[in-house]
Amino acid sequence: MTTATLLGAEPWSHIGRGSSGVLLIHGFTGSPSSMRGVAQACALAGFHVELPRLSGHGTTVADLVPARWSDWSADAETAYQTLRQRCDRIVVIGLSMGGALTLWLATHHPEIAGIVCINPVAQPLPDEMMSGLESLLRDGVESIPAIGSDIADPSAKEISYDATPVCALHSLFADGVNNFVKSYPSMTVPML
C-alpha cells in the first residue's frame, strides 16, 4: 500500500556548487521535515544536498507496517549513490534511525568524508526488550503508541506518526543495528 506523501514530508534535493555534498537521513516514524532546516542551511552554504523520504515514512502508519531495515538501508544507499554522482566529498548526517543508517553507510563506505549522528539508534536493543517485541508480534499486535515529540518548542511541529509498527521496529534492531554494531571498531570515517 502506498499513499500520497503528507504535505511537508516530501524528499528534498539541491544542486550545489563545487564537489562537496551532504546526505541527510530522518528518523523512524518521522519524515524529511525533521531535517529540512539543516538541509536548507547546507544548500545555502553551497553544498549539494540529498534528503530522501525513507520507505513507509511521511504517508500513513499503514505504509510503515511492511517496511523493513532492508528497505531503509536501500533508500540510504540509493540517496548516497545519487549524491556520489555529483560529489567527490560527502558528509552524512542522520537523526535517530537516520543516525543508525548513517553508521551503516560509514561501515560500507570508508570514503565518506565524515558523519554526524544526532541521537542515533546505535546500540542493540536489550534481550528483554527484543523478547517483548517478539511477544507482541506473536500476539498479533500491529502497532504501539508513538513515543511522541521531544521538541522543547511547543510551536514547532514535526511530521511524524502517532503509532509505531511493531514489526518495523523489530526489524530496525534485528535486521539492522544488532547486525552492524560489531563493525564499529573497524570504522575509519571521521565522526562528530
What are the roles of these predicted feature ranges?
Residues W104-H108:
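Active-site signature of alpha/beta-hydrolase-fold catalytic machinery across serine-
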Residues S13-G16, G30, S160-L192:
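Serine-hydrolase catalytic core
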Residues G94-G98, T102:
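Gly/Ala-rich beta-loop-alpha elbow adjacent to hydrolase catalytic centers
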Residues V116-P126:
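Active-site nucleophile loop of the alpha/beta-hydrolase fold
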Residues T3-T60:
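Short, surface-exposed "cap/lid" segments of acyl-processing enzymes
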Residues T60-R86, V91:
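Catalytic nucleophile-loop/oxyanion-hole region of alpha/beta-hydrolase
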Residues S131-I147:
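A catalytic-pocket lid/entrance helix-loop region that shapes and gates access to the active site
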